[in-house]
Amino acid sequence: MHGNSSCRLESLETVQYLLPQNISLFCFDFAGCGNSGGEYISLGWWERDDVALIVEHLREQRRVSTIALWGRSMGAVTALLHADRDPSIAALVLDSPFSNLSKLVNELAYQYTKLPSLLVSPVLQLVSNTIKNKVHFDIYKLSPIDHVKNSFIPALFATATGDDFIKPHHSQDLHDAYQGDKNFIKFEGDHNSARPTFFYDSASIFLFTTLQCGQLLTESTKFTAEQMKVRRKEIRDKKKAE
């Protein structure tokens, strides 16, 4: 699931890592993004309802066995907001979510203006009232950290050490408060930089285990998966050569 000001194309990088594990992907545009209709986004608040509908659709189609959610930034927040109300989700990959929206806004305001939170609060309240009228949700209630205490789904948290937009402590705080089985990966880069290979490899192994893909693979699909691994290496070598 993609971040703010993005679309489903953000998911393309994961294809070469997940398909060899016999893991299919459902990539989509949130409302108000990409080719989807809608005027506003809500940074996870209403997007979780998009996810609920998609999960319901996939289960009704009976073409998948288990379902995991992989999200970055807004997409990771959406996954956390959905997870505590749907414990049947098998796994979560959470790349750079914020822990609390009002906290994030105060941090960004101070970072770019050096204004103390005492001065930011009245402006934030004005913005909150406008959002309530137009988008119909309260930004003060957009707090993923309030949801993780009720989440028990295996989760892989990840953050870039140089992220100056959603700082690494947000992922750390969420990880520390999370109640389910959890892992945490840190890598070099910033909020929107390309993720390193070891992150994708770690996430692939994590999903292969939690989705129990090994129990579903037949000899024919194992052969196909091996071919895909070879092809993935060829793609990497080509990128390095370029």
Which sequence ranges carry the predicted segments?
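Short alpha-helix in the alpha/beta-hydrolase fold that links the catalytic acid
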Residues: 14, 144, 153, 167-176
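Hydrolase active-site cap/lid region
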Residues: 81-140, 146, 186
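Short beta-strand/loop motif that positions the catalytic acidic residue
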Residues: 150-152, 157-159, 163
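Conserved alpha/beta-hydrolase
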Residues: 15-37
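The serine-hydrolase catalytic nucleophile loop
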Residues: 4-17, 30, 169
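Alpha/beta-hydrolase active-site loop
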Residues: 10, 41-62
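Catalytic histidine neighborhood in serine/cysteine hydrolases
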Residues: 175-194
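Catalytic active-site module of serine/aspartate enzymes centered on a nucleophile-bearing elbow/loop
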Residues: 197-242
